[in-house]
């Protein structure tokens, strides 16, 4: 059975100001780069067999920094990209909250029913992510450890599948930038480990109080 180490990307420049990015290509902040270095130190002696990444820059750059000492190629997987947030992308949480009816609060409470205009439906996100993770796990049997660098929405959707949680509740999970979540499919071993980030700010936690993908 493979072990998937799911790492959320380091803090991006949009995370730092609570700006929705979705599938936009956004660079890491200086803090995000330092978080990626700390992630690299944490995995350096784990015998990582392969590294997979979302194609989006904030994840790809995190993977490049973290895996620099491993001597392994990065495999980009399109289905590991973050969920599209449609019309919200490029706007801040505060801007969305100021709209009539506070659609941000509605989305946090029920992201399945209260989808941002033009956004990717969560069931479709979960389907592609579960398929991608299954393919990665199947390629690395016999207990191999694999690093998968992706996004908060992606990891949350996958955890909901593994834990049997309704998609409407996925934002209750907390996932900090460059945290590690360990899954031995379908068993979840740990969620949001940040011990390797001691001394660094954890960045933007993916939680109901600070949710901005």
Q: How should each PLM-predicted stretch be described?
A:
Residues 2, 86-95, 138, 142-144, ...:
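Acidic, low-complexity terminal tails and accessory targeting/binding regions
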Residues 103-124, 213:
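Short glycine/proline- and acidic residue-enriched helix-loop micro-motifs
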Residues 4, 144-153:
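Generic beta-sheet signal
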Residues 38-104, 212-213:
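Phosphate-coordination/substrate-recognition cap region in phosphate-metabolizing enzymes
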């Amino acid at each position: 059975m493979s072990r998937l180490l799911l790492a959320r990307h380091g803090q991006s420049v949009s995370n730092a100001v609570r700006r929705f990015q979705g599938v936009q290509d956004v660079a890491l902040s200086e803090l995000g780069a330092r978080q990626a270095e700390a992630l690299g130190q944490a995995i350096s002696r784990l015998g990582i067999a392969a590294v997979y990444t979302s194609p989006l820059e904030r994840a790809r750059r995190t993977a490049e920094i973290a895996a620099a000492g491993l001597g392994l190629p990065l495999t980009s997987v399109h289905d590991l990209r973050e969920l599209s947030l449609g019309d919200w992308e490029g706007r801040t949480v505060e801007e969305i909250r100021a709209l009539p009816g506070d659609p941000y609060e509605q989305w946090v409470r029920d992201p399945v029913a209260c989808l941002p205009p033009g956004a990717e439906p969560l069931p479709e996100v979960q389907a592609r992510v579960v398929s991608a993770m299954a393919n990665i796990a199947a390629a690395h049997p016999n207990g191999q450890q694999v690093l998968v660098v992706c996004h908060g929405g992606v990891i949350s959707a996958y955890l909901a599948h593994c834990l049997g949680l309704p998609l409407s509740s996925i934002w209750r999970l907390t996932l900090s930038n460059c945290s590690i979540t360990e899954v031995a499919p379908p068993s979840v071993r740990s969620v949001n480990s940040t011990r390797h980030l001691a001394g660094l700010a954890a960045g933007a936690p993916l939680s109901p109080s600070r949710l901005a993908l």
